[in-house]
Amino acid sequence: MAVCAGRLKCFGNPAVSLRTAASRAYATTTSPDPAIPSSSSASSSSALPKRPQTSFRDKLNAGPSFSDFLSGGNRDDARILDPNEAYALKTALVGPKGKKKEITRLPSWLKTSIPDSNNYKRIKNDLRGLGLHTVCEEARCPNISECWGGSSKSAATATIMLMGDTCTRACRFCSVKTSKTPPPLDPHEPENTAEALSRWGLGYVVLTTVDRDDLIDGGARHFAETVIRIKQKAPNILVECLTGDYAGDLEMVALMAKSGLDVYAHNVETVEALTPHVRDRRANFQTSLRVLKAAKAAVPSLITKTSMMLGLGETEEQMWDALRQLRAANVDVVTFGQYMRPTKRHMPVHEYVRPDVFELWKDRALEMGFLYCASGPLVRSSYKAGEAFIENVLKKRRAESTGPESTNVPNVTPDAIVR
């Protein structure tokens, strides 16, 4: 009891408490001599469980320094890469263990943003409300956010697909649904399409269709009536029509060319040698050339346009041959884009063509006499069509044209079209 009382008296003394606290503080700031074992430290170390060693601290110590984040210097990775290294494709192993296979990653220059703009949502809602389809959605175009978004209404470009969403042909590159007996045409579609476009206030629109080999005229009269309705409701809008080949019926081609459209487009899709392997068996490179020639013959002031995909296995000589034939057919505009496989059911990509190669073919096309060439990995037939034509082709052609043809008044009326 005496001992306990003495200890209580010491702790109750302020002077003793201060000296004790000071000695404890000093003890924590001084390092004990490692040669002298401490019974208290030994007991505490045995009482506390040891943490497992991790390599996190080692990774930090061996990690990048501040100089690694600075450009320049004499480091090997600071040098400028040549195009072969910069555009080198990366691969990855995917699949379960033991069954992994190597795939080629999508190049960085082919990646796009997810569409989320207000203009995109508005156009999509209007399309659904009127029961209209677009090739942008059906063909899974990677540029939909850019084209539908647009910096303004007049800058936005929509590509409306007429005559339903089911095609009678089955090209190996296309993701549009196919059937031998697609649904019948909607008689209200021309009026609904014209109403939607006049409401949106777009400066440029691209109209395209599925192939309808089940119809006698291939749907040309339905297509022409739609153009006429649009020009009646929105005469200032520029209309580009991407048509099929109408099974080689050049009378239907002339009917479309005289409907009041501004640009007549028909895609050859690829070089002549690869056409049987890429397009439907009913499609033919020479037939496509005849379609483009017939459109120009029907309306000489009309702008004609075609598009080709790269990365299908075409050779340089085959490309030269295709361009020479297109120029001989007086085609005004050509576009080049990278083929991208929609699903595993479609033909695989033979090659991801580098952006500098697209630039090379653009320069070559312009040197051959094409009025305009859009060329790039993400370029599609209607990619930024309004911007390109307004600035580079259409205004120039209209300025040079004089007479009634320059006004582009339709030569036929809806009542004159015999169904």
From Swiss-Prot:
EC number: 2.8.1.8
Residues the entry annotates as binding [4Fe-4S] cluster 2: C167, C171, C174
Cofactor note: Binds 2 [4Fe-4S] clusters per subunit. One cluster is coordinated with 3 cysteines and an exchangeable S-adenosyl-L-methionine.
Gene3D superfamilies documented for this protein: Aldolase class I
Cofactor entry: [4Fe-4S] cluster
Reaction catalysis annotation: [[Fe-S] cluster scaffold protein carrying a second [4Fe-4S](2+) cluster] + N(6)-octanoyl-L-lysyl-[protein] + 2 oxidized [2Fe-2S]-[ferredoxin] + 2 S-adenosyl-L-methionine + 4 H(+) = [[Fe-S] cluster scaffold protein] + N(6)-[(R)-dihydrolipoyl]-L-lysyl-[protein] + 4 Fe(3+) + 2 hydrogen sulfide + 2 5'-deoxyadenosine + 2 L-methionine + 2 reduced [2Fe-2S]-[ferredoxin]
Annotated segments matching region Disordered: 28-61, 399-419
GO cellular component terms, semicolon-separated: mitochondrion
Superkingdom of origin organism: Eukaryota
Every Radical SAM core domain range: 150-371
Keywords of the record: 4Fe-4S, Iron, Iron-sulfur, Metal-binding, Mitochondrion, S-adenosyl-L-methionine, Transferase, Transit peptide
Residues annotated for [4Fe-4S] cluster 1 binding in this entry: C136, C141, C147, S382
Keyword S-adenosyl-L-methionine carried by entry: yes
Subcellular location: Mitochondrion
Residue range covered by the transit peptide: 1-26
Pathway the protein contributes to: Protein modification; protein lipoylation via endogenous pathway; protein N(6)-(lipoyl)lysine from octanoyl-[acyl-carrier-protein]: step 2/2
Record-level Gene Ontology MF annotations: 4 iron, 4 sulfur cluster binding; lipoate synthase activity; metal ion binding
Low complexity biased stretches: 28-47
Family: Belongs to the radical SAM superfamily. Lipoyl synthase family.
NCBIfam families, alphabetized: lipA (TIGR00510), PRK05481.1 (NF004019), PRK12928.1 (NF009544)
Name of the featured protein: Lipoyl synthase, mitochondrial
Species in which this protein is naturally found: Coccidioides posadasii (strain C735)
